[in-house]
Structure formats: C-alpha cells, structure tokens
C-alpha cells in the first residue's frame, strides 16, 4: 500500500512538474512572439548630411496605418532617446522613444524615429556636423522626416501625428504650423512654453540653488562639501566643465568628477573641506549660465550644443507667441509631470491657458503627480531615470486612437489630472 502511494505521489509530481515546465516554456515563447516589424531608413537632410531612421509597424496587416513621428529632446539624442551613461560595463541605458514606438506600433501605428544630425547610436558624435547645428536645422530636419514618413507605403499620409518631447515641444508646433495639411495631431511631452533664456536660468541657477539650500544643507550652515557635490547627479554636471562631464559619461568614473571639483575649488574650502553656497556655488552657477547665454564659449559642449546653437535658440519666439498659429483642425495633447524639474508643470499650464485664450477647439492637458521629465517617478529637484509609466503610454495611445480613426471611442485619461477644451471629440470630465 505504501509503495503504491509512493508511486502515485511520484506520478503526480511528475505531471505537475511537466505542467509547470510547459507553462514556463509557453511564457518564454510568448516573450519572443513578433508583434511589430522594424525597417531601417536613411533620411537625406540636405547639404550632404544624412541620418539613420527606423520605422516600426504592426506585425500583421498591410496598412496603411496612421503615422507618428517622434521628435526628441535636447542634447545629443539618437533615435531611441538613449538616456544615461553609455559604457561597456554599466547598466543598459534607457530608450524612451523606442519604448513609445513599440507601444504604439503594437497597437496599430506606424512610428518613425530618427537620429539627430551628426549623432549615431550610443552617443557617437560627428563633431563637425553636430557642432554647427542650430535649432533651425533641427526644425527643418523634422520637416524632412515628416515627408519621409508620409511616403512610406505602410503609412496613411492623411493621418499623421507628431510626438515632441522637451526640446521637441519647441519643434513640433512649428512643423505643424508649416505643414498644416499633413500634420493632424501633436502630442507635447515635457512642455516648453515661455522664454528659453528664462527657462535655462531656472534649470541651471534657481532650482539648483534652492535644492542645495533646502535639501543638502540640512543644518542650514550655508556650507556644502565637495564630497556631497561629487555624489550628486544634478549638481556635479552643472558645476564641472563640459570636457569633464563628457569623460564621466563615457567612463562612469566618479573620481573624474571629484578631481575636477577639487581643481575648481582649490584654496576655497575651509579646513573641513566645505565651501560656501552663497560665495562659491552661486557665483559659479551664474558664471556657467552667463557663459552659455553670452555665446562666448570658445569650446563646444559636445554632449549638449555649441554657442551657434544657443544663439539661434535664444532668438526664437517662445511657444506662447506662436501656438495660436496652429490650425484649429489640429488636435493638441499636452502632457507634463508635476515633478518635472527641467520643464516645470507651470509651463504646461501657461500653454494650455494660451490655447484656451485663442479658442483652440481641440486640446487637452494632462498632468501626472510625482512624475518627472522622463515620465517616471521623480522628486521635484531632479529627474530620476526610469521607463515611461505604462499609464502615460496608455493615455498617449488612447488619445491618438480617438484622433486617428482607429476607433470611435472618446478619450478618457487613466491616472492624472485632466483639463480639456470644450470639444465633442473628447471626454470633458475631470479626473484626479
């Protein structure tokens, strides 16, 4: 009897084990089911300059699918929006634009992403091209990309939308204004509304100083140590020269930061190695900002831009001055994290107010509590690296779905504060 029970137990365990392994194999196989297709393209930007691009489309169906162009944020950005240190031994960097493209293409959209001029994968830079780039070049590049997207056989040229993030929120409205018959909708994420000069001062002087005084100087001594600065991801890149910043991004060696700071503040620390916030940190932050805004820098920061770029950027009319020129038939979705330290949520409120003032009939603002510039949980002081939250992606898709003819459903955001225009095509109920 006991032997029979033992055999039954063994057989039962064997069946259970087999079932578990089958479930695991099925789950593993599910991960490799192809839901989207990729096609690499080359965009001719003119004057002998070309850049790589990639189109993602649903794996099933011939289309034509509604098209989406993603316009990236500031700095040296490849088509994936690669964020974070890029080096052999470090963690995988984030790729937020690839994340958006995959999400939308799995659900029925053809999405085009492209490298900025002079930029290749993993922050490889053609210094001659990148160092002479201006915001006007980037606007024209986006127009070229829209034309390429519209020509793809899988894309319906009558249903094209643009997603712009950060700096892309400066470019996208201008492309929409100049291509009003092609661009049906724009999605602006991490919004720039007012003067670029004022926004950069906030980013590089006002907010860092407030952070140092309220967070790092816990004892209210007016002092901070070099060790504290070298460990702080926001402060260290604002205070050190761009050459040191670039070396750090390539090596992820914090000693590079510490050594650079010690040279900057040589003979300016007290016995304990502390420096004055008011007399050392503040003047250096202002000096870095003035060097940038005066266009007097003789050396380019290849991670960001050169003076030729900032000169053109600062002369650009703010979005508040041009947003009223967008066609009334163009749908506008505004998205902003409430803890965004680079493009504060107040920027989004201003743009929404302006759209209301000019009686734009189809716009909606969604703000997300606790999310930062990358639409990931962040403090109000600095951007935390992480993937875009799924409910943000769901909001983008739902709105585009309702505005691209994929469904007749009304748009209802998931997990945010919503402020909508009076329009029959949107759900006007506020959620929180």
PLM region spans:
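Primarily recognizes the serine-hydrolase "nucleophile elbow" in alpha/beta-hydrolase
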Residues: 148-154, 158-205
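Short, surface-exposed "cap/lid" segments of acyl-processing enzymes
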Residues: 61-64, 68-103
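Conserved alpha/beta-hydrolase "acid-adjacent" motif
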Residues: 341-347
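Short beta-strand/loop motif that positions the catalytic acidic residue
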Residues: 334-336, 340
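Catalytic active-site module of serine/aspartate enzymes centered on a nucleophile-bearing elbow/loop
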Residues: 380-420
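N-terminal cap/lid segment of alpha/beta-hydrolase-fold proteins
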Residues: 28-63
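Accessory cap/linker subdomain of secreted extracellular hydrolases
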Residues: 189-325
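Alpha/beta-hydrolase active-site loop
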Residues: 131-152
């Amino acid at each position: 009897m006991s032997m029979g029970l033992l055999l039954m137990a063994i057989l039962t365990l064997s069946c259970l084990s087999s079932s578990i392994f089958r479930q695991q194999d099925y789950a593993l196989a599910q991960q490799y089911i192809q839901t989207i297709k990729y096609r690499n393209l080359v965009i001719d930007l003119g004057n002998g300059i070309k850049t790589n691009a990639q189109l993602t489309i649903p794996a099933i169906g011939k289309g034509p699918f509604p098209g989406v162009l993603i316009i990236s944020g500031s700095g040296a950005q490849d088509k994936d929006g690669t964020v974070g240190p890029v080096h052999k031994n470090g963690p995988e960097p984030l790729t937020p634009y690839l994340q958006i493209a995959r999400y939308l293409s799995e659900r029925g959209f053809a999405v085009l992403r492209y490298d900025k001029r002079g930029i290749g994968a993993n922050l490889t830079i053609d210094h001659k091209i990148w160092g002479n780039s201006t915001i006007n070049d980037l606007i024209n590049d986006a127009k070229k990309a829209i034309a390429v997207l519209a020509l793809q056989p899988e894309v319906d040229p009558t249903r094209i939308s643009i997603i712009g993030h950060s700096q892309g929120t400066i470019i996208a409205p201008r492309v929409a204004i100049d291509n009003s018959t092609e661009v049906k909708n724009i999605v602006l994420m991490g919004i720039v509304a007012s003067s670029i000069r004022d926004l950069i001062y906030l980013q590089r002087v006002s907010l860092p100083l407030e952070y140092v005084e309220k967070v790092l100087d816990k004892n209210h001594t007016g002092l901070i140590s070099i060790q504290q600065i070298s460990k702080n991801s926001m402060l260290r890149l604002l205070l050190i020269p761009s050459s040191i910043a670039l070396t750090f991004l390539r090596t992820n060696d914090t000693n590079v930061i510490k050594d650079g700071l010690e040279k900057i503040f040589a003979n300016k620390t007290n016995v304990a190695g502390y420096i004055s916030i008011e007399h050392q940190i503040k003047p250096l932050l202002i000096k870095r900002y003035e060097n940038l805004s005066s266009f007097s820098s003789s050396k380019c920061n290849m991670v960001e831009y050169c003076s030729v770029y900032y000169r053109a950027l600062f002369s650009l009319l703010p979005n508040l001055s041009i947003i009223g020129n967008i066609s009334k038939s163009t749908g506008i979705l505004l998205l902003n994290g409430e803890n965004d330290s680079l493009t504060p949520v107040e920027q989004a409120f201003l743009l929404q107010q302006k759209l209301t003032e000019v009686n734009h009939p189809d716009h909606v603002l969604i703000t997300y509590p606790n999310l930062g510039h990358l639409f990931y949980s962040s403090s109000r002081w600095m951007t935390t690296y992480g993937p875009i939250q799924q409910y943000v992606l769901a909001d983008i898709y739902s709105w585009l779905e309702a505005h691209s003819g994929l469904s007749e459903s009304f748009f209802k955001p998931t997990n945010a504060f919503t402020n909508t225009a009076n329009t029959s095509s949107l759900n006007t109920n506020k959620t929180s």
